[in-house]
């Protein structure tokens, strides 16, 4: 059953508490998801009644009813000073790759599974969000990766990633051969199913499942995690975030290789191509409720043991 709010026009901005850090708020969510739509409707109504200017990402705006200002992600980035993403970490990652180029805060309402990046509960967000809007929040910057594919010295494709850039064999799993260089220094050759280059943000995602270490978000580091290497001695390695990672694909590999950015964007790779992964100049400005504790998040999301004494 849908929720039918009678949404009136925003009040004058002068009605907003003068300590408020935000004035124009963008709402982003997972399209065609009933729970997300209900939360977005509540958010839109609640924010509008408090006098905020509210923009809604166009993919979900049509499902929220009339009197909604629908815009794309780029316009949210340009016009808003806060974006609220309703969904799971995948929705947050997709929005973050676009919004990181703008100077706005981003906070998440969890409508997914784990929700490492989405702090607010979907059914009781008002109290915590009210404090955030009154200026009681912690800010955390997360750097992104830039992944580039070169063919015969020419740039063929590029994109950014919040979590990780992954070299892999495409749709059919099989072993591939490649060399890895750190700052143009040869590190090793690999025969493996691929390679994960992860940020600290991504170290609790795909890299963790592949046996990588957890990096705290404030670390300026990257972790390289081989995927099912055909050796007994290969281990993940952590390098400085300023390092340039180069992977050279053997010309003897088959075709249809890919580099995936956060599992969303796929860059085609051919035998002999070079993949460059480095830290992007863009940063995501995450907003957390005051007192956010990263290790508490790890305990609750990953099921770590409770304190014994």
From Swiss-Prot:
Q: Which residues bind NAD(+)?
A: 89-90, 163-164, 174, 191, 193, 204-209
GO MF, any single term: metal ion binding
Could you list this entry's UniProt keywords, alphabetically sorted. Answer: ATP-binding, Cytoplasm, Kinase, NAD, NADP, Nucleotide-binding, Transferase
Keyword Kinase attributed: yes
Per the UniProt entry, the disulfide pairs are: none
Task: Give the GO terms filed under biological process for this record.
Answer: NAD metabolic process; NADP biosynthetic process
Q: Where in the cell is it found?
A: Cytoplasm
InterPro entries from the xrefs?
ATP-NAD_kinase_N, ATP-NAD_kinase_PpnK-typ_C, NAD/diacylglycerol_kinase_sf, NADK
* Catalytic site: 89
For this record, the Gene Ontology CC terms, alphabetical, are: cytoplasm
EC annotation from Swiss-Prot or TrEMBL: 2.7.1.23
Q: Which SUPFAM superfamilies match?
A: NAD kinase/diacylglycerol kinase-like
Q: Which domain of life is it from?
A: Bacteria
Matching Gene3D superfamilies: Probable inorganic polyphosphate/atp-NAD kinase, domain 1, Probable inorganic polyphosphate/atp-NAD kinase, domain 2
Kindly state which reaction or reactions the protein catalyses.
NAD(+) + ATP = ADP + NADP(+) + H(+)
Name the needed cofactors.
a divalent metal cation
NCBIfam families tied to this protein: PRK01231.1, PRK03378.1
Which PANTHER family does the UniProt entry name for this protein? NAD KINASE (PTHR20275:SF0)
Q: Which HAMAP family match?
A: NAD_kinase
User: Could you tell me what this protein is called?
Assistant: NAD kinase
